[in-house]
Amino acid sequence: MGYCSGRCTLIFICGMQLVCVLERQIFDFLGYQWAPILANFVHIIIVILGLFGTIQYRPRYITGYAVWLVLWVTWNVFVICFYLEAGDLSKETDLILTFNISMHRSWWMENGPGCTVTSVTPAPDWAPEDHRYITVSGCFLEYQYIEVAHSSLQIVLALAGFIYACYVVKCITEEEDSFDFIGGFDSYGYQGPQKTSHLQLQPMYMQIPLDNN
């Protein structure tokens, strides 16, 4: 009963991870955040494999899913540190999330709740010609906190998924071991006698009484 509930819970967690990461992937595409797009894509593939392993009782798939969750948590911790500008990181000057190929920022920077975007003209000399220079004001919630909330939710789901993945793998392994033990005992206790393929033929003699009359 506990194993069934744990397996069902892991399936639910995988489903929630897929929904949340797909929502995040859409907004990362809108903001041209190439590093998160790549990480999200890999995460989607691994979660699908973990979901398949949970449904089909494949412990190797679930183990790979659990290992990936450790890396996924590490990535989301880095994203949180980036947007909160921990250490030497700066969300305004560093272009890590776009692989340094564009100056795009998070989609939520201009489209957050209550944000008002104002174009600045003329643009500074250092601004690229294909980019507009803007100011954003009036946001109810700054974009970096929205990104931090997204990453925090992913961390919570990943930790829950890791715990239940380990539990399900443990239950599947114990169940397989018990089946192997029962099968080995039955085959040993109830194995029929072996038939030899070579039979030695012996001549048979019959004594027939003779009538002297």
UniProtKB/Swiss-Prot annotation:
- Report the PANTHER family cross-referenced here: SODIUM_POTASSIUM-TRANSPORTING ATPASE SUBUNIT BETA-1-INTERACTING PROTEIN 2, T-CELL LYMPHOMA BREAKPOINT-ASSOCIATED TARGET 1-RELATED
**Protein family (similarity comment):** Belongs to the NKAIN family.
The molecule here is called Sodium/potassium-transporting ATPase subunit beta-1-interacting protein 2
Q: Which sequence ranges are marked TM in the entry?
A: 5-27, 35-55, 62-82, 153-173
What GO biological process, any one, is recorded here? regulation of sodium ion transport
One Pfam family of this chain: NKAIN
Q: Which organism is it from?
A: Bos taurus (Bovine)
**Could you describe the subunit structure of this protein?**
Interacts with ATP1B1.
Any one GO cellular component localisation term in the record:
plasma membrane
Q: How does it sit in the membrane?
A: Multi-pass membrane protein
Q: What are the UniProt keywords, alphabetically?
A: Cell membrane, Membrane, Transmembrane, Transmembrane helix
